[in-house]
Structures are given as structure tokens and as C-alpha cells.
């Protein structure tokens, strides 16, 4: 009888312990469920935040796409500009060659002008000599009337030479005028070439400035891409951490539920054993 009582007390104590463990397991389960719910809420919040980040990333991706298209357009323009620069360089080379030829022609014209001026000077000196001779002949005519016929002959000869020299002078003056016109024409052409060269130089400077501007924009787009990539990696890391935490909590809940189920089975077995003992006592 004492053994039965002792066994009943032990069974009762085991039952109480089982009930305590069951209550503790139920409490742990509720706490775990609350923690799981909190983590689920956190996960939902993180998912919303991740969704917002993805939306923002999509927006920046679209902006990046536009930026890349603009960059490609800028690169195309830069390539076209480089082609224009090469074309302008070739044109400048042709202009420089034409300028060299114009300078050579101008030097030739100046040389001819100098020769014409020398010829005009010689003609002028010849005219002065003839004039001096005519004056001397007139003096001789006044002083020596007996030599009138000879003086007239000398005068006629002098007039003839004078007319010939005058005719040559007219020809030289005409050549001089044409030479001056050609020189002025060459000078005008040189001025036009200089203006065109200035325009080409300014266009080259403008193209270089545009190329630098496109390069600065390209650096800015690359920096934005790097920032967005870092944000995406950070969001993915947070999402992976949240998923691992949820998986860990779900495993903890499963373990607690298994333990609770085991405690319930143990409690059921103890209750059945206690009932059998009570039945045995009643039968006695």
C-alpha cells in the first residue's frame, strides 16, 4: 500500500512537472509565435522597403538607360566631332598649302613689281636726259641761228625718242597697274584665308569643350551607377539576413511544437498510468 501511495505521489509529481513543462512549452510557443509574428511583420516591412528600393532602382535604371542612350549619342557626336576635326585638319592643311602657293605668287608679283618700278625709274631718267638735251638744243638754237636746220633735226630726233620713251612708259605703267591689282587680289585672298583659319580654330575649340563636357557627364553617370549598385547589394544582403532569421525561427517553432507534442504524449501516458493505478486502488 505504501508503495502504491509512493508510486501515486511520484506519478502525481511527474504529472505536475509534466503540466509545468507543458505550460512552459505553451508559453515558449506563444512567445515564439509572437516573435515569429514580429519577425514576419519585420519581414513584410523589409519586403515593402525592398519593393520600394526595387522601384527606386527601376526608376534609376530607367534614368541610367536614358543616361546611357544620351551617353551613346554623346559618344556618336564626339566621334562625328572627331571626324569633323580630322576633316577640318585636312582642310586646314589644304588652306595652308593654298596659302603657301598664294604667298609664292605674291612674292613673284612683288618681284615683278620691283622690276617694273626699276624699269619706270630708268624710263624716267631717260626722259630727263632727253629733256636736258632738248633744253640744250633750244639754247643752241637761240645762240646759233646759223645751225637752225641741224638743231631742228636734233629736235625732231629728240621728239621721236621722247615719244618712243613715252610709249614705253605707258606700257610699263599699264603693267605696273595690273601687277598692283594682282597684288591687291592676292592680299584680299590672304585675308579671306586668315579669316577662314580663325573660324576653323574657333570651331575646333568649341568641339574640344563639348568633348570635355561629355567626358564629365560620363564620369557622373558611372558614379551614379556605382551608388545604385551598392544600394542594391545592401538591400539584397538585408533580405537574405531576414530570410535566414525567419527560417531559423520557423525551425525553433517546429522544435517547440515537437517538444510540446512529446510532453502532451508523456502527460497522456502519465494520466493513463495514474488512472490505472486509481482503478487498481479502487478494486483493492
From Swiss-Prot:
Mention any Pfam family matching this sequence. Tropomyosin
Cite a single GO BP annotation: myeloid cell development
Q: Where is this region: Disordered?
A: 1-37
GO molecular function terms listed in the Swiss-Prot or TrEMBL record? actin filament binding; identical protein binding; protein heterodimerization activity; protein homodimerization activity
Q: Which Gene3D superfamilies match?
A: 1.20.5.170, 1.20.5.340
* Entry keywords, A to Z: Actin-binding, Coiled coil, Cytoplasm, Cytoskeleton, Muscle protein
Query: What family is it from?
Result: Belongs to the tropomyosin family.
Complex and partners: Homodimer. Heterodimer of an alpha (TPM1, TPM3 or TPM4) and a beta (TPM2) chain.
Record-given protein name: Tropomyosin alpha-1 chain
Biological source species = Danio rerio
Amino acid at each position: 500500500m505504501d508503495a502504491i501511495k509512493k508510486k501515486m505521489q511520484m506519478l502525481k509529481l511527474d504529472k505536475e512537472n509534466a503540466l509545468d513543462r507543458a505550460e512552459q512549452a505553451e508559453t515558449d510557443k506563444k512567445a515564439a509565435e509572437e516573435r515569429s509574428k514580429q519577425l514576419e511583420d519585420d519581414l513584410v516591412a523589409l519586403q515593402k522597403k525592398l519593393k520600394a528600393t526595387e522601384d527606386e532602382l527601376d526608376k534609376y535604371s530607367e534614368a541610367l538607360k536614358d543616361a546611357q542612350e544620351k551617353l551613346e549619342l554623346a559618344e556618336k557626336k564626339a566621334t562625328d566631332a572627331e571626324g569633323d576635326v580630322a576633316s577640318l585638319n585636312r582642310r586646314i592643311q589644304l588652306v595652308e598649302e593654298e596659302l603657301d602657293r598664294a604667298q609664292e605668287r605674291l612674292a613673284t608679283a612683288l618681284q615683278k613689281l620691283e622690276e617694273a618700278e626699276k624699269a619706270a625709274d630708268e624710263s624716267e631718267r631717260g626722259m630727263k636726259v632727253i629733256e636736258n638735251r632738248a633744253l640744250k638744243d633750244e639754247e643752241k638754237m637761240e645762240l646759233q641761228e646759223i645751225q637752225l636746220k641741224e638743231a631742228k633735226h636734233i629736235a625732231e630726233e629728240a621728239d621721236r625718242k621722247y615719244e618712243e620713251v613715252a610709249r614705253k612708259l605707258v606700257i610699263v605703267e599699264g603693267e605696273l597697274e595690273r601687277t598692283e591689282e594682282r597684288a591687291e587680289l592676292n592680299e584680299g585672298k590672304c585675308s579671306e584665308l586668315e579669316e577662314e583659319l580663325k573660324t576653323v580654330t574657333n570651331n575646333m575649340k568649341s568641339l574640344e569643350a563639348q568633348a570635355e563636357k561629355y567626358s564629365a557627364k560620363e564620369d557622373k553617370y558611372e558614379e551614379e551607377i556605382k551608388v545604385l549598385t551598392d544600394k542594391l547589394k545592401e538591400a539584397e544582403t538585408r533580405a537574405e539576413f531576414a530570410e535566414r532569421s525567419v527560417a531559423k525561427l520557423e525551425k525553433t517553432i517546429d522544435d517547440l511544437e515537437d517538444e510540446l507534442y512529446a510532453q502532451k504524449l508523456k502527460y497522456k501516458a502519465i494520466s493513463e498510468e495514474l488512472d490505472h493505478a486509481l482503478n487498481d486502488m479502487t478494486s483493492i
